[in-house]
Amino acid sequence: MAYRKRGAKRENLPQQNERLQEKEIEKDVDVTMENKNNNRKQQLSDKVLSQKEEIITDAQDDIKIAGEIKKSSKEESKQLLEILKTKEDHQKEIQYEILQKTIPTFESKESILKKLEDIRPEQAKKQMKLFRIFEPKQLPIYRANGEKELRNRWYWKLKKDTLPDGDYDVREYFLNLYDQILIEMPDYLLLKDMAVENKNSRDAGKVVDSETANICDAIFQDEETEGVVRRFIADMRQQVQADRNIVNYPSILHPIDHAFNEYFLNHQLVEPLNNEIIFNYIPERIRNDVNYILNMDMNLPSTARYIRPNLLQDRLNLHDNFESLWDTITTSNYILARSVVPDLKEKELVSTEAQIQKMSQDLQLEALTIQSETQFLAGINSQAANDCFKTLIAAMLSQRTMSLDFVTTNYMSLISGMWLLTVIPNDMFLRESLVACELAIINTIVYPAFGMQRMHYRNGDPQTPFQIAEQQIQNFQVANWLHFINNNRFRQVVIDGVLNQTLNDNIRNGQVINQLMEALMQLSRQQFPTMPVDYKRSIQRGILLLSNRLGQLVDLTRLVSYNYETLMACVTMNMQHVQTLTTEKLQLTSVTSLCMLIGNTTVIPSPQTLFHYYNINVNFHSNYNERINDAVAIITAANRLNLYQKKMKSIVEDFLKRLQIFDVPRVPDDQMYRLRDRLRLLPVERRRLDIFNLILMNMEQIERASDKIAQGVIIAYRDMQLERDEMYGYVNIARNLDGYQQINLEELMRTGDYGQITNMLLNNQPVALVGALPFVTDSSVISLIAKLDATVFAQIVKLRKVDTLKPILYKINSDSNDFYLVANYDWIPTSTTKVYKQVPQPFDFRASMHMLTSNLTFTVYSDLLSFVSADTVEPINAVAFDNMRIMNEL
């Protein structure tokens, strides 16, 4: 019988079929199929929204349903699984995107490793020229009537004249100059390396650098140069005192440049290098390790020098409240550590096929009645074993948090996890992951063995499942083992000034494995009263597989401990332990692989690997401290220069960029500002403070040497006469502000109150606005005449901002094309402004000639360990801290 569907139930089954078809179409990535999909969606929506009632029959429905069932329920379940998987993947992508917003993303592992390896001692700071801000330049001389003479005069001018206008911008320029000096500041100066021949010398003498030689050439060729100066240049040469290993070179420097270079020479970071220093540079635990045979080259020259690395500890405490930064540091340390942990190659492991065959025999797989035991052999391979070995040691070295991946039904994984939790301190695992693993072990193995009810663990419970179980289990051996795990923490020990996270002695010597085996034996002897016999047998067989390898597990524990402690000796930064934002995933099946495949071959780091690891750690740590010193100095300088608009965040960003490993744009702002606050609390390093004081004392001298800016402007209500200036001609330039009332231009611009100026000008009192202004030159006489009486200055002040006022430098001289216009000497040119510009320092040869002193020669060695040749004993004979072989099972 036909019936009519009404209301919400209309088109129910066809709609369901359409949806199933839609899902199938969504799986296909083909573009044409997507177009069909869109059409079907449109048809579906048209059907649902249409007012037309459609009549169908029972028989048709039955046929459709039967057809769907016949197509196979497997396809539907498979489809459902795919949908769930897609949803799960989508959730992971969303979580990853959320994480990306808060955690710095990292480049590929190879690039991070390369960046770490590329941080080297500052060899780039080996100077081939002296540091200079100034250079001498020739300027013409003008007569009283404005005509240019043929004579020239030498003045000190800026080498790189990029001074901006505006007092604030000029102060910012000095901050950038300071930053540039910090980058260029040499660790050492060897004048012999930069000395060049003096072409005008009588006896092939040398001067300190090429720029000094060029200045000497220019002065020697200048017609104005006195004969006595020429004779002096001809006599300029180096003076060697070989017995004292000292050489003096003549140099021509501005007094400020001389002060900088003299400071660099007197505060070099190089120190004499001898065998004792190299001996003490090698980590003490490596020196005393009987497995390594070290020989030192005793033929060090007396001129050998080295730069002591800056290895101060925990100045910023990045582990405290800097989650993203700490995550980046631990990640790069983890990648570096993984690269130096020795590989367990296939020849060092038991053959995978042979081991699986042996395990199959132990399990009597041919007589299996349950499926779960076949999982025991799943995923066991040498690559997983090697990966697990490297992950465990590298994570502990870098203090990276690990998270565990496991399947609860794989009892072998859980039993291997019991070894893992016994050997690795609890702190190394993500809390949630640790709780999940412990709960699985308790509810799958421990509680069923004693016939106890399942543990119902409350999320957020301060106690872990093992801590709860320790109080409830009566069996001494199992409770004792649980107690050990619950109290398994790193011991913090300071060795050679570095905080080390050391393992418990019972783990180091492998004795804890006996404790684990006692607990496992007790569990295998229990009756599992509430569980089927097959379940009990599966657990017992899993325990049997692990207990058969008791000797190898003891050796494995000793091997992990030895490799960890040996590599830990090469870590130079305090090993602070804080849970990291991201984690390193560890599959419990790979732990099973490691437990089952570990052989009797001892694997220890090669001495070359240890030295490489140590050098990279030292270089990164030293660079980290130097960049902190730079950032602290720049922040202090910005405050002392009153740069109130300076964004401190930019200083912190520069600091992080110079550390190489950070992706700065992804560091959250709150951590940037917290880092700024920490940097503010640190004292400025002495050398950097002295350099800043040198700049601070000489800011005016540097400003005076610039052609870009003037130091102020005098404005008046009435015109002022132009005056003769020797450097520029007939101009509106004032060389001093005597007799003028002065107002600070920066304060005036900040307040915007021009009333004071207006009142003074209306009272016919000239006023001097003091501050850095653009020094604009206009030598056209026509423009001078046009602007003479064009405006009343009081009106300019009312209508315009003073910071837009461009004082004009008027030149009237014989070079002007319009010179004939001023043939009438009765006409007196005037201006309503006068530019206040200080006189640059004249170049005086005698005052600029300085003798600089440095060592005649020395050699700086950056890699001290290159003097040490090292070898290892035969691995089979390698011993641990207790003087017993690392691997006892032969």
From Swiss-Prot:
Region (Hydrophobic), start-end ranges: 404-424, 432-452
GO CC terms: T=2 icosahedral viral capsid; viral inner capsid; viral nucleocapsid
Any one GO MF annotation of this record: RNA binding
Signal peptide span: none
Location in the cell: Virion
Transmembrane domains' residue ranges: none
Amino acid composition bias (Basic and acidic residues), ranges on this chain: 19-30
Region of interest called Disordered, as start-end residue ranges on this chain: 1-46
Region of interest: 5-fold hub: 1-88
Assembly and interaction partners: Homodecamer; each decamer is made up of two conformers of VP2, called VP2A and VP2B. Interacts with a VP1-VP3 complex. Interacts with the intermediate capsid protein VP6. Interacts with NSP5. Interacts (via N-terminus) with NSP2.
Family: Belongs to the rotavirus VP2 family.
Protein's name according to its UniProt entry: Inner capsid protein VP2
Source taxonomy: Viruses, Riboviria, Orthornavirae, Duplornaviricota, Resentoviricetes
